[in-house]
């Protein structure tokens, strides 16, 4: 029973995160509209509130294109895997109601964020374009260099929290 409750809680958490990101993009579009002295998205529904759902429907009904010489499966799986990794990071966040009890939540966070490097590298490699591969390798080098400083800052906070 506890497993089912934690599964439902994590599913609810993921849905809430995705919906909140959709409404944050709506807020961003509204703010950019007011900066440019216009209303922003307000044509759909009441004050444009259903606009993120319309954008999602439009996104899922678009034609799927891919490079002709690409590795089709890895070209599409790597962004999906990256999305799943970023959603898994939310599982180790300390909430008021504990979904999962992690003894090593910080290590899980570092592992999930560092696995995102491989998705960028696989996406660049699977397109079979030299420019995409170079861009992917550049992003990998940047991400790895930032992860080292993130890990050192996290360990310093962890070390000084026990003093």
Curated annotation (Swiss-Prot):
It comes from Drosophila azteca (Fruit fly). Its EC number is 7.1.1.2. It is an enzyme of class 7 (translocase). It catalyses: a ubiquinone + NADH + 5 H(+)(in) = a ubiquinol + NAD(+) + 4 H(+)(out). GO terms for biological process: aerobic respiration. The keyword Cytoplasm does not apply. This is NADH-ubiquinone oxidoreductase chain 1. Keywords: Electron transport, Membrane, Mitochondrion, Mitochondrion inner membrane, NAD, Respiratory chain, Translocase, Transmembrane, Transmembrane helix, Transport, Ubiquinone. PROSITE patterns: COMPLEX1_ND1_1. It comes from the Eukaryota. It is found in: Mitochondrion inner membrane. It is a multi-pass membrane protein. GO terms for molecular function: NADH dehydrogenase (ubiquinone) activity. InterPro entries: NADH_UbQ_OxRdtase_su1/FPO (IPR001694), NADH_UbQ_OxRdtase_su1_CS (IPR018086). The chain crosses the membrane at residues 3-23, 77-97, 104-124, 143-163. Core subunit of the mitochondrial membrane respiratory chain NADH dehydrogenase (Complex I) that is believed to belong to the minimal assembly required for catalysis. Complex I functions in the transfer of electrons from NADH to the respiratory chain. The immediate electron acceptor for the enzyme is believed to be ubiquinone. GO terms for cellular component: mitochondrial inner membrane. Belongs to the complex I subunit 1 family.
């Amino acid at each position: 029973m506890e497993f089912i409750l934690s599964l439902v809680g994590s599913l609810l958490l993921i849905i809430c995160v995705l919906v909140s990101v959709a409404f944050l993009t709506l807020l961003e579009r509204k703010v950019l509209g007011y900066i440019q002295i216009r209303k922003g998205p307000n044509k759909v529904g009441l004050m444009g509130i259903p606009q993120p759902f319309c954008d999602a429907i439009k996104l899922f009904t678009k034609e799927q294109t891919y490079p002709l010489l690409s590795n089709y499966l890895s070209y599409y799986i790597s962004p999906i895997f990256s999305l799943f990794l970023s959603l898994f990071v939310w599982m180790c966040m300390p909430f008021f109601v504990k979904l999962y009890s992690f003894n090593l939540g910080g290590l899980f966070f570092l592992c999930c964020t560092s696995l995102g490097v491989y998705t960028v590298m696989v996406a660049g490699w699977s397109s079979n374009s030299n420019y995409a591969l170079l861009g992917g390798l550049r992003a990998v080098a940047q991400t790895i260099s930032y992860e080292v400083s993130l890990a050192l800052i996290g360990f310093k906070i962890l070390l000084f929290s026990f003093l």
